[in-house]
């Protein structure tokens, strides 16, 4: 190639390939290895995922993606969603197609069609296999915006027309075809449908078009796909376990919460068992915050729109709020609060503060309201009314880093006590410079504050990812996220750096020279939303909570009804010691009562009969070790009180009962 202009392709391992002419990604993959090319799903060029058919004509970094890569697997699944849509329209020509992306655990496609039964899904799977067996190549082509609209109008696909009409004038629209079926899509996709080796359609449900209850209700089919049948089998087994742990099912079975249509979506009823758990969590969090220097506030559930106009929520978050009144007709318009911060600012402003008074740490167990779309509602994880341990720290600039780190330490302590510290990921949520109207403040302030948070996380040796566009409108934040049993990630705890709202609310302190200075603010949750935390714990422990959180901690089981009196005396002493206890005095067989207690996830059973009554003892059975032998009643009370006080998480050694 001497004397010729060459294109240099830098591969993932740092090696380089030189070409004298433009080259498709798939051809470069074959140059590397035929095995790699056969396994390839897509390419990653300078960080952007592209089709294998993409032609490269300039120097770049290239990574060949296979289904072993998360991004490569997403491409495979996206193609599987197209094959599913083709199969649906082959079998049900009247079905209109909407959207069909890949997701963390597979893929889905939305159809304007009546709900699909399990038998329908099985038939669609068979049709997909026929399509895959034919092995059609996948081709990409483009049309002008006008031609694309005309194309889908002719095919009577209104959802595709709407999507295209939302795109700018003059936009070039990309399509993908496989055989005689074509879809609107940005891609990328596999080279051929033959690349789909193992897939399964999982379920069908309802979903609003574009996630808004104002739009048409569609039918969504969920599926998943993997590179091999063994991987698919493993995933399906995990899904079965996920269904068993799903808080939406288990939480209802355990009488922790329920929902009622006439009350409304996203408005769960917390049952007595759930209230016990929430109260335990609240007492613990509030006591811990008090130890760490917080003082508590109690502020209104609503405020005039004027408050939210000062804070910026009216301009940046109004669509997520429940507004009471009409600005055009009413003298005063109110809104239920979506967060507590502006209220606590006025608690701070009620007095003048010296630099010596800071930091001031304000905590509140708040009830908040957010107008989530109906399509987003799910059990306890996404609701319209929720409870949260919220806090705002008003600090001097020189105190900001230490206090922010202390907030991270409090969050980590909470995670450790709950036994979930290994289950979370940390995210630096940043602003999006390309979407400045979403935020307040100057770019240099955002860059500086994001830099401070990045440095802190690095100093604390916390692995984290950076997420552009996920910041609050007034500042960057650390989000601590966890996945539910189905792999969907939710934010559990948030800690936000705010260098802007103190000025909005004219907050100040008096420095050592007698001058007014602006404080900084930290917005934080110590444990996050109680409802979402309950969902998380239900799924984490499959309802087998640490004893201190169990709605019922001990069940006394007399071996026959004639020992009910002694059982009730044992229960009374338990309750006197602050232990949640009941007696099963029914005339059922012992084995039945023990099994039922285990199914109801009671951690300790105390069996009492003649010997126990005579000696003032109890025979202890636990879900941890099974038979733990006979113990003095006082000894057992001391033991379980210590376990509850220390919030011990005991390892379960015995096999769980199954319903």
Give each language-model segment a name:
Residues 2-96, 103-659:
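NTP/phosphate- and nucleic-acid-binding module
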